């Protein structure tokens, strides 16, 4: 039987089909992992464990190995995988690099401020691997476009003036990337934007931690005034009302999904399924990374 997984937040809370379930976490001891306590079926049904293909659509902050235990339908977490913010961003880049090799002309497609999709992904990979890049300004520009486009796509009300101003400042780039000339490369473009968002989350964990908790809680209430934080990628707004940046695992899901769509757009549904199969294999490699 292949491995089974459970995706949770850092506290062991799983979100699945509108239900939340708390899993006791395994503990790493000197002799190896001590499994968490068994989770029994409840009023919401049996505990949900996933194979690697199912996990691709339900990536979370943490991913644990799980196994059946006790009565029928019960399960427990037995060990953590190697999944992390950095592995999520690396997986997003894996998906995008693979699809840029497949879709003709996608790697050479130019960004609003110059450069190409292929170049920005190479810069993002360099930053993720080495913590530095010669193209940090463009990485920041693209990550802000990514956030603004996602908020526009989700019809999310941006509830504070500071972030609204920041989104407007990137507005020209957002609009240019909506131009009909991008139509045939739309899915590849969106995959690139999602991957850069994932790397931004890793690059600046002090932003990521705050936004991650807000994203998980779906906070909408007014909180402390917005902070403008200067980083090597430029200025970012944090705080205010509502989450503004997707966590790295959400961006990784988006990058994978849009990469599959790019393959399907090019060569039909079987190509999208083939891309999914490749992604599942790569995801398992990331989960097992040392």
Enumerate the language-model features and the residues they cover:
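Short, glycine-biased loop/turn motifs at secondary-structure junctions and
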Residues: 1-290
């Amino acid at each position: 039987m292949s491995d089974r997984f459970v995706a949770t937040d850092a506290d062991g809370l799983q979100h699945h089909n509108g239900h939340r379930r708390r899993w006791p976490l395994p503990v790493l001891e000197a002799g190896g992992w001590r499994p968490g306590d068994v989770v029994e079926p409840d009023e919401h049904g049996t505990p949900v464990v996933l194979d690697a293909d199912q996990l691709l659509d339900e990536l979370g902050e943490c991913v644990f190995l799980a196994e059946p235990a006790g009565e029928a339908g019960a399960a427990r977490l037995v060990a953590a995988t190697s999944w992390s913010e950095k592995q999520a961003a690396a997986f997003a880049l894996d998906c995008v690099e693979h699809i840029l090799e497949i879709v003709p002309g996608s790697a050479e497609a130019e960004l609003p401020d110059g450069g190409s999709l292929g170049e920005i992904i190479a810069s993002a990979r360099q930053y993720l691997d080495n913590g530095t890049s010669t193209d940090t300004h463009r990485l920041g520009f693209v990550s802000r476009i990514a956030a603004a486009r996602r908020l526009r796509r989700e019809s999310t009300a941006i509830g504070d003036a500071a972030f609204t101003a920041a989104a407007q400042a990137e507005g020209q780039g957002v609009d240019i990337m909506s131009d009909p000339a991008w139509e045939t490369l739309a899915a590849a473009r969106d995959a690139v934007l999602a991957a850069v968002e994932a790397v931004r989350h890793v690059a600046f964990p002090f932003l990521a931690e705050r936004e991650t908790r807000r994203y998980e809680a779906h906070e909408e209430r007014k909180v402390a005034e917005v902070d403008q934080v200067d980083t090597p990628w430029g200025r970012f707004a944090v705080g205010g009302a509502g989450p503004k940046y997707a966590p790295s695992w959400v961006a990784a899901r988006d990058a994978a999904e849009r990469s599959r769509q790019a393959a399907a757009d090019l060569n039909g549904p079987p190509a999208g399924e083939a891309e999914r199969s490749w992604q599942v294999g790569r995801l398992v490699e990331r989960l097992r990374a040392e």
